[in-house]
Curated annotation (Swiss-Prot):
PANTHER family: HIGH MOBILITY GROUP PROTEIN 2 (PTHR46040), HIGH MOBILITY GROUP PROTEIN 20A-RELATED (PTHR46040:SF1)
Name this protein carries in UniProt: High mobility group protein 20A
PROSITE patterns: HMG_BOX_2 (PS50118)
Gene Ontology biological process terms in this record: regulation of gene expression
Region (Disordered): 1-130, 166-206
Originating species: Xenopus laevis (African clawed frog)
InterPro entries (UniProt xref): ChromReg_NeuronalGeneExpr (IPR051965), HMG_box_dom (IPR009071), HMG_box_dom_sf (IPR036910)
Length: 345
């Protein structure tokens, strides 16, 4: 009977039930919800295929979670610091070439140097940054024709610097400085490349052994006393600097007053020179007139008549003769009076 039943083909109702069971989402080891559904056989082909698909999805989900966890761990790791200049470390400047020609000054710098000294003299109480701001404002408001003067001077200075630089580049001093600069640049590049390279553990240990360790007692009483002494010294230096600046300002005022006095005396001296030249011209004209008018009046007791070169000596001798013999010289005195009256006329 059992063999006969097993040989009977399934009916259409059984096929429909089996189709309904396959359309439901299977779960391994569980039953489908619903009172009308029957439990699935664990060894059915449909259940094995669903379990394989579920296992594949589970493994892919775990792999994605693992990848995302690794990404988060990589993001949480501190990023390696990029190579560059250490914070707090001062960059060393290249040594200056003392033999090189002096660099040219711009028009604004020339105006600032000239105007800054004037402002410091006129207003010594104004601080340096305020003076710089005032000079910058004046330069921006300066007319174009006045500004052109400083720009022309700067252009001349630039031409001078170009010529001197061309001459200097042909000298041995420049060649020596250029070789030293190239060697310094090469050494700096090598040091930077050495810093970029990551040393091994043994190299790190050797570096730590060779590096001296300085124990700086910054919180001890001696260090605090040293800091206080340095602060007191700095305060004293600032005070001395302020006193010297005040003295310098007073001396600048005194120098300006002396300059104005010298200029005033020079103006008076030039006026006196002009007056002297006018008096010399007038005296020369008087000598010429006396020489011309007294040609016929000789000195008493002599035959001496005046000339342009001897008029001063002639007048002195004539005065002595008149004072010595006044009665005998009355005729000469009357003649001289007539001549002088003609001269005045």
């Amino acid at each position: 009977m059992e063999s006969t039943a097993s040989a009977v083909p399934p009916s259409s109702e059984d096929l429909v039930a089996d189709t309904k069971e396959n359309n439901q989402p299977p779960f391994c080891g569980t039953t489908v919800s619903g009172s009308s559904q029957a439990p699935l056989h664990p060894h059915s082909p449909t259940l094995q295929q669903d379990e394989r698909e579920e296992l594949t999805l589970h493994q892919s989900g775990e792999q994605q979670l693992g990848n995302s966890g690794e990404l988060r761990q990589e993001e949480e790791l501190p990023k390696a610091r990029r190579g560059g200049w250490n914070k707090g470390r001062k960059r060393k400047r290249s040594p200056r070439d003392n033999n090189a020609p002096k660099a040219p000054l711009t028009g604004y710098v020339r105006f600032m140097n000239e105007r800054r000294e004037q402002l410091r003299t006129e207003r010594p109480d104004v601080p340096f940054p305020e003076i710089t701001r005032i000079v910058g404002s004046e330069w921006s408001k300066l007319p174009a024709h006045e500004k052109q003067h400083y720009l022309d001077e700067a252009e001349k200075d630039k031409e001078r610097y170009t010529k001197e630089l061309q001459k200097y580049q042909n000298t041995d001093a420049y060649q020596t400085y250029s070789r030293k600069a190239k060697s310094r640049q090469k050494g700096r590049q090598q040091r930077q490349e050495g810093v970029r390279g990551v040393p091994s553990n043994t190299e790190k240990e050797s570096i730590l052994k060779e590096r001296p360790i300085f124990d700086i007692p910054i919180f001890t009483e001696e260090f605090l006393n040293h800091s206080k002494a340095r602060e007191a010294e700095l305060r004293q230096l600032r005070k001395s600097n302020m006193e010297f600046e005040e003295r310098n300002a007073a001396l600048q005022k005194h120098v300006e007053s002396m300059r104005s006095a010298v200029q005033r005396l020079e103006a008076e001296l030039s006026q006196e020179h002009e007056r002297n030249s006018l008096l010399q011209q007038h005296l020369q004209s008087v000598r010429q007139a006396l020489t011309h008018c007294l040609q016929s009046v000789p000195v008493p007791g002599t035959t001496e008549t005046p000339t342009l070169e001897t008029i001063d000596l002639y007048m002195s001798r004539l005065q002595n003769a008149v004072l010595t013999h006044p009665k005998e010289s009355e005729v000469i005195i009357s003649g001289v009076r007539e001549v002088l009256s003609q001269l005045e006329g």
